[in-house]
Amino acid sequence: MSSTDDVKQARSRVFFDITIGGKAAGRIVFELYNDIVPKTAENFRALCTGEKGVGKLGKPLHYKGSTFHRVIKQFMIQGGDFTAGNGTGGESIYGAKFEDENFQLKHDRPFLLSMANAGPGTNGSQFFVTTVPTPHLDGKHVVFGEVLSGKSVVRQIENLKTQGDKPTKDAVIADCGELSGDAAVSADTKTADAYGDEYEDFPEDEATDGQPLSASKILKIATDCKDFGNKAFKAGDLPVALDKYQKGLRYLNEDPELDNEPADTKQKLDALRVSLNSNAALMNMKLSAWDECIRSADGALAVATISDKDRAKALYRRGYAQVRIKDEDSALTSLEEAKKLAPEDGAIVNELAAVKKAAAARMAKEKAAYKKFFS
């Protein structure tokens, strides 16, 4: 075993089990740099296990139950205030605060674990995870670890809606601790979910060595995401199916370089963009998410090479959703166009007839009301 392997084996590996809005979101596993910043790493490790008991402020020295109280997209997610919960509190295992150990490591990439502070020598329990490189923090905050797995969970937190940088849904460290034995050794091994998906949720996290994904790789991943979504749909797991289709679209949105790709790659990417958007529209229909259904259908319709069959399908799904948000005029336009493209489609014909019938009834009612008013 190399000396590098020895060092990595000696590094602590700890975990957070996260809930968002009361629902399980997944596990984040961190590797701590005990070999570079041992005091800082030990503080975090012990706060994950809770082994130090109650602190001087009367609260358990434990991250369990605390939240990510500050989230700034394209910057970082911050947590660790288990005393006040709002960024004003926290306590280290050494007392209220401890000194900056060293600034040897730089904030040169996403998914680094670093100490939050209120100035030099004010480290407590608060920490942040970078979601982009943040070089302006070098020399001011101590980097002491990195995310080994669970990057998608970090991204979920990063993408939460916020009010004054505070997430509108609570992102809670429901459980935390230290990994040991086989669990620690395998912590950085990618594992597939129930549908076979082992890709990162966001394409920038799937890329290696800072190199953008090739068009062929994006095509494969997005195709796989469609298959994962189809499996989830057949299993009746509609929210997961929707997530998989939307994940595939995130990869397609990378707009890869096509110069050195096979001639039909763009055609395949466009066809996949249509089907993923159309499938997402269907999931949103079934979940009664009408605005999202319209946006997904519009995504399919925006592809210039969409076939008449797929256009009719997307127009129907858009029209169906427009009816449900009481946008009758837009629904009529969508459904009329869909019927021109697929005049024998029973669902389109029936929905259009229902909209016209409702419109006629509304007009008759309005006419009767006006007549009564002027009589």
From Swiss-Prot:
GO terms for biological process: protein folding; protein refolding. Residues 15-178 form the PPIase cyclophilin-type domain. Its main location: cytoplasm. SUPFAM superfamilies: Cyclophilin-like (SSF50891), TPR-like (SSF48452). InterPro entries: Cyclophilin-like_dom_sf, Cyclophilin-type_PPIase_CS, Cyclophilin-type_PPIase_dom, TPR-like_helical_dom_sf, TPR_rpt. It is found in: Cytoplasm. It catalyses: [protein]-peptidylproline (omega=180) = [protein]-peptidylproline (omega=0). GO terms for molecular function: cyclosporin A binding; peptidyl-prolyl cis-trans isomerase activity; ribosome binding; unfolded protein binding. Keywords: Cytoplasm, Isomerase, Repeat, Rotamase, TPR repeat. Pfam families: Pro_isomerase. GO terms for cellular component: cytoplasm; intracellular membrane-bounded organelle. TPR repeats lie at residues 222-255, 274-307, 312-345. Its EC number is 5.2.1.8. It comes from the Eukaryota. PROSITE patterns: CSA_PPIASE_1, CSA_PPIASE_2, TPR, TPR_REGION. PPIases accelerate the folding of proteins. It catalyzes the cis-trans isomerization of proline imidic peptide bonds in oligopeptides. Interacts with CyPBP37. Belongs to the cyclophilin-type PPIase family. PPIase D subfamily. This is 41 kDa peptidyl-prolyl cis-trans isomerase. It comes from Neurospora crassa (strain ATCC 24698 / 74-OR23-1A / CBS 708.71 / DSM 1257 / FGSC 987). The gene is cyp41.
